[in-house]
């Protein structure tokens, strides 16, 4: 038995159930692929293609036994056979939410990179004969779904909030609708701040703190849901392998942090210590602009990403028996509480 309660596969096993990972080169997708392989899954990565590659038939296999297929989601082209033999499909495709400012053009790109990809995969999966369909489609979302909710404890049963991110996540989750209506089990991963030195928003924050540019945001009262990369990948694999899990899943650690505590931990871990504070009035102004559908400046982006209070808890994962290896943030940076 491996960590998180997930069984490990015998060494050398490569003929297990098929897992198709869309955006398999991303931070979470690449770690999920490695973890699933070690648990006995046969991995297939779906890559964005160059000219002419999307129509390539068949599946290519590299020296490690990993399979590769191609697609061109903007043109709604998926390589024939890409889903053949896939018992599960994970679609986490989407342009990075930060650090580029949310200009109108950027907002359109953020939406298109999520909605068109998820919708295409869902439609193709739904169109397959019942015997050839994957058992589960796991698609992306984020805790931005909830908007700014103060101290409210946010389980998967809570509704959406307001703002650009909330609307984007609502549409993102709905994009998997064709698969759900066809009877496939669908799961939507509402992911928090992923803490990793390898990439993602957590890496961007760490880089800022290392050069002394980290800051507490306003009063620092806002709750910020986070999760370590290992737990994030394991949580996705757990959701894939447990048929009783369906619908939204908060991919967050059990102990969300207030911003002031996140600031304290990152200052200690990354140094040099920072006493900087972004004035609350600036966050409030940026937040009002974002909810009103403003032009999407850097301030609006920070207000929704880090200024909003989202006390999200992983009720679905905990209720199903998933075990977190890093339930508290201090352990991620090797610090005491």
Regions found by a protein language model. Name each.
Residues 235, 242-297, 334-336:
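Mid/C-terminal beta-alpha module of Rossmann-like enzyme folds, strongest
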Residues 18-38:
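N-terminal Rossmann NAD(P)H-binding glycine-rich loop of SDR-like oxidoreductase domains
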Residues 182, 195-205, 230, 239-249:
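Glycine/proline-rich active-site loop of Rossmann-fold NAD(P)-dependent oxidoreductases
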Residues 141-142, 174-197:
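Conserved beta-loop-beta element that borders a ligand/cofactor-binding pocket
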Residues 1-13, 303-337:
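C-terminal amphipathic/interface module of NAD(P)-dependent oxidoreductases
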Residues 118-163:
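Conserved Rossmann-fold NAD(P)-dependent oxidoreductase catalytic core, especially the SDR/UDP-sugar
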Residues 204-231:
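A conserved pocket-lining segment of Rossmann-fold NAD(P)-dependent short-chain dehydrogenase/reductase
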């Amino acid at each position: 038995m491996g960590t998180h309660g997930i069984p490990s596969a015998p060494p050398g096993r490569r003929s297990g159930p098929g897992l198709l990972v869309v955006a398999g080169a991303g931070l979470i997708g690449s770690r999920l692929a490695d973890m699933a392989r070690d648990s006995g899954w046969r991995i297939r990565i779906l890559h964005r293609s160059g000219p002419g590659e999307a129509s390539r038939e068949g599946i290519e296999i590299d020296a490690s036994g990993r399979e590769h297929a191609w697609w061109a989601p903007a043109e709604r082209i998926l390589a024939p056979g890409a889903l053949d033999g896939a018992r599960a499909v994970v679609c986490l495709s989407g342009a990075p939410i930060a650090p580029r400012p949310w200009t109108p053009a950027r907002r359109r790109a953020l939406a298109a990179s999520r909605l068109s990809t998820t919708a295409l995969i869902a439609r193709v999966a739904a169109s397959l004969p019942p015997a050839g369909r994957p058992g589960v489609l796991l698609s992306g979302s984020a805790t931005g779904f909830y908007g700014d909710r103060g101290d409210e404890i946010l389980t998967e049963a809570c509704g959406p909030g307001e703002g650009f991110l909330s609307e984007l996540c609502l549409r993102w989750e709905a994009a998997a609708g064709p698969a759900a209506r066809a009877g496939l089990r669908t799961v939507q991963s509402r992911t928090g701040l992923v803490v990793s030195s390898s990439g993602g928003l957590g890496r961007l924050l760490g880089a800022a703190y290392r050069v002394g540019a980290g800051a507490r945001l306003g009063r620092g009262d806002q709750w910020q849901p986070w999760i370590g990369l290992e737990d994030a990948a394991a949580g996705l694999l757990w959701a894939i392998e447990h048929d009783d899990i369906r619908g939204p899943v908060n991919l967050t650690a059990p102990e969300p942090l207030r911003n002031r505590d996140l600031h304290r931990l990152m200052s200690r871990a990354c140094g040099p210590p920072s006493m900087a504070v972004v004035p609350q009035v600036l966050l409030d102004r940026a937040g009002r602009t974002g909810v009103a559908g403003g032009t999407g400046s850097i301030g609006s982006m920070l207000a929704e990403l880090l200024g909003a209070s989202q006390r999200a808890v992983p009720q679905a994962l905990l209720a199903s028996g998933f075990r977190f290896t890093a339930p508290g943030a201090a352990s991620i940076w090797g610090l005491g509480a």
